[in-house]
């Protein structure tokens, strides 16, 4: 009976751990929504947290990729953003909270969103692969 209990316990534990591992959503890229902001698209855009720390920019993307494709794509609405091949599948959508930098060319996101992106980036390659789209006004 102990052996049966141990096997059942082990099986339940494995299923539980597998379930938690698969419950983390896998994102295929990032969409930053700047539709309501006075944002100026730029080839050298930076995404910053509320403390001014860079979350994404040219330093995160290989020079070869950036030269061929740019570090972001710009679109006019969420439907275009989600359909963009750069992030297609299951992109994470983040709302930009303000603009900053010369000519309003950089976006600021909440510290919570920045933390989430940094956490995801530890396990996914969407930042260094330039899988980023920005929705512009």
Question: What would you call each of these model-derived segments?
Answer:
Residues 1, 20-137:
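Domain-level marker for long, solvent-exposed, non-transmembrane regions
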Residues 1-7:
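Positively charged n-region of N-terminal signal peptides that target proteins for export
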Residues 7-16, 20:
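Bacterial N-terminal signal peptides
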């Amino acid at each position: 009976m102990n052996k049966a209990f141990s096997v059942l316990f082990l099986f339940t534990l494995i299923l539980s751990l597998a379930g938690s591992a698969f419950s983390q959503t896998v994102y295929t890229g990032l969409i930053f929504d700047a539709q309501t902001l006075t944002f100026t698209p730029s080839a050298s855009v930076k995404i910053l947290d509320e403390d001014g720390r860079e979350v994404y920019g040219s330093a995160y993307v290989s020079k070869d990729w950036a030269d061929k494709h740019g570090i972001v794509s710009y679109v006019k609405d969420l439907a275009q953003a989600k359909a963009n091949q750069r992030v297609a599948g299951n992109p994470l959508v983040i709302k930009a909270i303000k603009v900053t930098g010369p000519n309003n060319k950089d976006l600021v996101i909440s510290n919570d969103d920045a933390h989430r992106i940094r956490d995801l980036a530890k396990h996914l390659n969407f930042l260094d692969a330039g899988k980023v789209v920005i929705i512009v006004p």
